[in-house]
């Protein structure tokens, strides 16, 4: 019997909605990354994007344990000399709440073109509204 490998054109992708309110950031991100890769499916193939689309709501209400609200730092560089910028978790939640979840999930996905394709299937929103009603997403309880 031959080993089954999924073909990109035959993969069935579903849409899911996840509410991030009160969920721990890392535990939520690992489950999102797992589902974006498609590891929860029987037809998972490492070199094919078999994952589902995921909509994350209430990103501003995601939780972190311990003192990470003040201690966790996010860095980026402007491109100019001495242009390293840092922001705490609390500052990031105030300015760009979606980015906190996006950064956490992106770090857990493969690096390269396949990982970028998987990451594009993640839609994160700060509030409770999204514009993907036409896709009829199912509620995913994590």
From Swiss-Prot:
Pfam families (UniProt xref): Ribosomal_L13
Listed SUPFAM superfamilies: Ribosomal protein L13 (SSF52161)
Gene Ontology biological-process annotations: negative regulation of translation; translation
Any one GO MF annotation of this record: mRNA binding
Coiled-coil ranges from the UniProt annotation: none
Keywords: Ribonucleoprotein, Ribosomal protein
CDD domains associated with the record: Ribosomal_L13
Annotated GO CC locations: cytosolic large ribosomal subunit
NCBIfam families linked to this entry: rplM_bact
Family classification: Belongs to the universal ribosomal protein uL13 family.
Name of the protein this chain belongs to: Large ribosomal subunit protein uL13
Species whose genome carries this gene: Edwardsiella ictaluri (strain 93-146)
């Amino acid at each position: 019997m031959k080993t089954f490998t999924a073909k990109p054109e035959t993969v069935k992708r579903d849409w899911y909605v996840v509410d991030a309110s009160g969920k721990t950031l890392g535990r939520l991100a690992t489950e999102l990354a797992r589902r974006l890769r498609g590891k929860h499916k029987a037809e998972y193939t490492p070199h094919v994007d078999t994952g589902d689309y995921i909509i994350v709501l209430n990103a501003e209400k995601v939780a972190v344990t311990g003192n990470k609200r003040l201690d966790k730092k996010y860095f980026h560089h402007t491109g100019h000399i001495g242009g390293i910028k840092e922001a705490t978790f609390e500052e990031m939640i105030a300015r760009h709440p979606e980015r906190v979840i996006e950064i956490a999930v992106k770090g857990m996905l493969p690096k390269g073109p396949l990982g970028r394709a998987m990451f594009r299937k993640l839609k994160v929103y700060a509030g409770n509204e999204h514009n993907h009603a036409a896709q009829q997403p199912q509620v995913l309880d994590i």
